[in-house]
Amino acid sequence: MNIKITGKELKATDAIKNYIDTKAERIEKYFDTEDINLFVTIKKEGGDQVAEMQISVNGESFRAVTASNDLYASIDKDIDILEGQIRKWKLKRTSKIWQNL
């Protein structure tokens, strides 16, 4: 998995990078390819810390944006949202394959 982290008004520390790497492993299990690109943007908007994530794999794109007081909570919520989107996409894709048999 290729992960690119960008910080706007926030610095992407090693702790944040390691946390994102660890959480991104949950996404990796849904795909059998290594060609997964995860783009993460962390920024500060008002009093909130925003995590924006976008995954592109096999021509598909998934996106999540979450804001909260805690950056780590925003990252967790984004991963949960992305995981739900990917599960829904895979279920829809496999059900269409079975319908065509």
Task: Show which residues each predicted segment covers.
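N-terminal, polar/charged subdomain of small-to-medium soluble alpha/beta proteins
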Residues: M1-L101
